[in-house]
UniProtKB/Swiss-Prot annotation:
Annotated Basic and acidic residues bias: 468-486
Its job: GTPase that associates with pre-60S ribosomal subunits in the nucleolus and is required for their nuclear export and maturation.
Name used for this protein in its record: Nucleolar GTP-binding protein 2
Domain CP-type G: 211-372
Gene that encodes the chain: NOG2
GO cellular component, one term: nucleolus
Alphabetized InterPro entries for the sequence: G_CP_dom (IPR030378), GNL2_CP_dom (IPR024929), GTP-bd (IPR006073), GTP-bd_ortho_bundle_sf (IPR023179), NOG2_N_dom (IPR012971), P-loop_NTPase (IPR027417), TRAFAC_YlqF/YawG_RiboMat (IPR050755)
Lineage: superkingdom: Eukaryota
Ranges of compositional bias, category Acidic residues: 487-504
Keyword terms, alphabetized: GTP-binding, Nucleotide-binding, Nucleus, Ribosome biogenesis
SUPFAM superfamilies linked to this entry: P-loop containing nucleoside triphosphate hydrolases
Binding-site positions, GTP: G321, Y322, P323, N324, T325, G326, K327, S328, D365, C366, P367, G368, I369
Region feature Disordered, mapped onto this chain: 1-23, 459-513
Length: 513
């Protein structure tokens, strides 16, 4: 009995519980059951033939004889699938036109709507050329003709061939540039603006690899979050990318997130949120794993988008924006742990990556992009944190721009100096205070300038771009941001004054008595 029990346990342990007398056809000493089933998988789906080669049993879908079938007599097979009257169509078109610019209205079931009929722009404009309106027949032919010769582009056949080949070559180059680089080939060109020569370092964030990463993130995302710097929201907004999404991907949701709102006064952040909310849903955010702001509002907004798309198993949320605006930091804040590499320098994120936030919500991190623009100077690009300061040549030439953007009192409080006349004097005073001197006691202008630029970009020096006047929440002096210690001190002084005022009437009554 012990031997049989051991044999039974051995079969269970090895997964061979079937009786040894029952075998699969083809199983022998050389092929076990698993190998025979694997080989039968390749033989399946073929026809069976006899010794003469005639087909005895046809393979699946090989037999030409079709069984007799009958289609159910239903008029829905031959009618229109979706029908709408002209009155309903015009009413829906008017309602769509009224709510089209409202960023808080979402159009559902876009795939089932005749968007070509609802789009007023496509229906209003005619694709045909208006030749007769510009030049009628009477001015070209007949007795009232105003010209003797027709206008032709070329005087000879050779000239026409050369001009055609040149135009075709230019068109092909433009098509190739737009297809490979997309938005990278588009620049904001206006009359009176010329493209100035810049250093190679100021073209960071414009490579083909970065734009390919951006397009992958946009194509894979259902909701796109554009991260802006609260100190300069309009400067760090990629206008060409937002226009591309509005025209090419209107079914994707785009929202703005004002990050680093802890570096500006509360009224400035509120004014920028009010101004940008007219275009897209906007949230104020402070990225921090331990002490964040706006995290609950952002998660609640993502849950609302998830509820809008109940038909999908999950939704993807992509983060785009300028370098060093805090895209990876926001993802770490939402996850409450470090899942993305972050650094106070631009270009830390090299490729896109997927992060799971919830069961139905996924996050996509994207490298920072810098759309090319002829309006942006080297100073503007540097002050937005796009370029690493240690790679900039002659950094002392950008210090006058910092002195214009920042208040004198903030610089005095940060570096504990006062009485400078210009940027050179400002750099020299900081160098001598910190002991950063070269041979002969000369100040290290380059090293101190890089330190000032890093302090400017990393928030150690208070500065911000003031919001539009009509969107200001309160009439306060720009840059008047109080530190927490000063606010607590003022609150304590006010409480002491109130206590003194309450004690004075009591003391007067005691004296009278």
């Amino acid at each position: 009995m012990g031997t049989g029990k051991k044999e039974k346990q051995r079969r269970i342990r090895e997964g061979n519980t079937k009786d040894g007398n029952l075998r699969v056809k083809g199983e022998n000493f050389y092929r076990d059951t698993k190998r025979v089933q694997f080989l039968n998988m390749y033989k399946g789906g073929r026809s069976v033939r006899n010794a003469k080669g005639d087909i005895i049993k046809a393979a699946p879908l090989q037999d030409t004889a079709a069984p007799t079938a009958r289609v159910a007599p239903d008029r829905r097979w031959f009618g229109n699938t979706r029908v709408i009257s002209q009155d309903s169509l015009s009413h829906f078109r008017e309602a769509l036109g009224e709510n089209k610019r409202d960023s808080y209205q979402v159009l559902l079931r876009r795939n089932k709507l005749p968007m070509s009929l609802l789009n007023e722009k496509d229906s209003a404009e005619s694709p045909t050329a208006k030749i007769l309106e510009t030049e009628p027949f009477e001015q070209t032919f007949g007795p009232k003709a105003q010209r003797k010769k027709p206008r032709i582009a070329a005087s000879s056949l050779e000239e026409l061939i050369s001009s055609t080949s040149t135009d075709n070559k230019t068109f092909e180059e433009k098509q190739e540039l737009d297809s490979t680089l997309g938005l990278m080939g588009k620049q904001e060109e206006e009359d009176g603006w010329t493209q100035a020569a810049k250093e190679a370092i100021f073209h960071k964030g414009q490579s083909k690899r970065i734009w390919n990463e951006l397009y992958k993130v946009i194509d894979s995302s259902d909701v796109v979050i554009h991260v802006l710097d609260a100190r300069d929201p309009l400067g760090t907004r990629c206008k060409s990318v937002t226009d591309y999404m509005t025209n090419e991907t209107p079914h994707k949701h785009l929202i703005y997130v004002l990050n680093k709102c802890d570096l500006v006064p509360t009224w400035v952040a509120a004014a920028w949120v009010k101004h940008l909310s007219k275009e897209r849903p906007t949230l104020a955010f402070h990225a921090s794993i331990t002490n964040s702001f706006g995290k609950g509002s952002l998660i609640q907004l993502l849950r609302q988008f998830s509820q809008l798309h109940k038909d999908r198993h999950q939704i993807s949320v992509g983060f785009i924006g300028y370098p060093n605006t805090g895209k990876s930091s926001i993802i770490n804040t939402l996850r409450k742990k470090k899942v993305c590499q972050v650094a106070p320098i631009p270009g830390e994120t090299k490729v896109w990556q997927y992060i799971t936030l919830m069961k139905r919500i996924f996050l996509i991190d994207c490298p920072g992009i810098v759309p090319p623009s002829s309006k942006d100077s080297e100073e503007d690009i540097l002050f937005r944190g796009v370029v690493r300061v240690e790679h900039v040549s002659h950094p002392e030439q950008y210090i006058p721009g910092i002195l214009k953007r920042c208040k004198r009192q903030h610089l005095e409080r940060t570096y504990e100096i006062s009485g400078w006349k210009d940027s050179v004097d400002f750099i020299e005073m900081i160098a001598r205070k910190q002991g950063r001197l070269l041979k002969g006691g000369e100040p290290d202008e380059s090293g101190v300038s890089k330190q000032i630029l890093n302090d400017f970009n990393r928030g150690k020096i208070p500065w911000f771009v003031p919001p539009p006047e009509k969107d200001k929440i309160e009439e306060k002096e720009p840059g008047d941001k109080k530190r927490p210690a000063e606010e607590n001190q003022e609150d304590q002084e006010e409480e002491e004054k109130e206590q003194e005022e309450q004690e004075e009437p009591v003391s007067k009554k005691a004296k009278k008595e």
